[in-house]
Amino acid sequence: MTLLNNTWTLLLLCFLAGLGLSAGQDIHQMQYHLEKLTSVRHPFGADPNAREAARSYIKEQFQQYGLEVAVHTFSTTVWHQGQQRTVAGENVIGVSEGAGGGPLLLVGADYDTALNRHPLEDNGAGVGAMLEVARNYMAATGPDGVFTRNSTVIFVAFDLNTLEYDGSTGEPGAYHFVHQWLWPHLNQSLLKFAGAIILDSISKINMDQNSQYLPQDFGKAFPSAYKRISEDGNKGDFLALVTRGTSQSKRLKDTFTGNYLKRRKAGLIRLQELVVHTNSPVSIPTLEMINHQAHYHFWTFQPSDQLTALPALLLTDTDFYRKSSEECPLPCSAEAFLTRQRKQSLALTCSGVLYTLLDMQAERRRPGETGEVTSGASVGVTLAMTWLLAAVAAILH
């Protein structure tokens, strides 16, 4: 292995250490999550047990982390073999109750798949990232952590994203969750909701020119983003942050952006904001780029005659609008899927989400309080120190 590759490996390992547990353990944990998500998870897929197995795994992980697990059941319709079929779905919810009573914050990802999609790209990596954020958040705010849980955080694995199923007209699991579980849980009060962070297709990075497709009229909806992407040769070298330009969304967007950029180093994946302003209608081609993920059901929530838009941001690689530079033909193992570039990208995304939760929903313990950090549960390792250690190790090597 070359010195450059050694350096990148060490930088990555140390970067992951800042997420909360030892770097090797984080890499192992992410791979372990993805190994449970390598199969197509569709109600009429080749393996009828794959979706149930993934659901059971998510529940087990939530329980191990110390989250209070709830299950929200619903029914919807799925188009299959020329007819609409009614199917049952389960949204899996893990609740970390806060003591301070502030507005709750949500992190979510779809855990099912369409029949013709890559199960790790869409959306196994998103589920794995959500699980890692949940694991590290609970460790950071647990007995050995340096934070206390002030406001509630909930982690949600959504089932049956029918908007990605060809020809299906049934409402997806995220829609039913917002209407049937979340809104009653909030006592129908927008003031009790800090927002949602949705992870949907986050692993495709491509540094090649013309690897990023932009829909017609994309430039009208997102002029600054269009200019940046075009001038950069239409490269798929960014993580897109899709949000609405409302005051309710601003704090969530700014907190995540600050945490992401603070931990991003040269060469790592940049962040591209796509802000949908209420006074600037988005054309249908561009809207179709951002309306099939779970966040959209928060934006369009309408419990009565009046629209009650809930703040939510989407983190995405833009899904099928981007060509992957690291194909992993099916069946694709978790080990083969987790290339160096994907590890870097997923680590940065997890870190940004984790520190957003800690900033918004937790409080750092004061000196002398119980809960001093142990080596296995620390999120206090500074990134400056880890990068320095990586550089020194590379030189010594």
Positions of the model-derived regions?
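A non-catalytic alpha/beta surface segment that caps or lines the substrate-entry region
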Residues: Y32-A99, E273
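Active-site-adjacent substrate-binding region
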Residues: G195, I202-G368
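Second-shell loop/turn segments in exported
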Residues: G24, S39-E52, W79-Q83, A114-G124, ...
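Acidic/histidine-rich catalytic neighborhood of metal-dependent amide-processing enzymes
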Residues: A114-Q248
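C-terminal GPI-anchoring signal of eukaryotic secretory precursors
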Residues: R365-T386
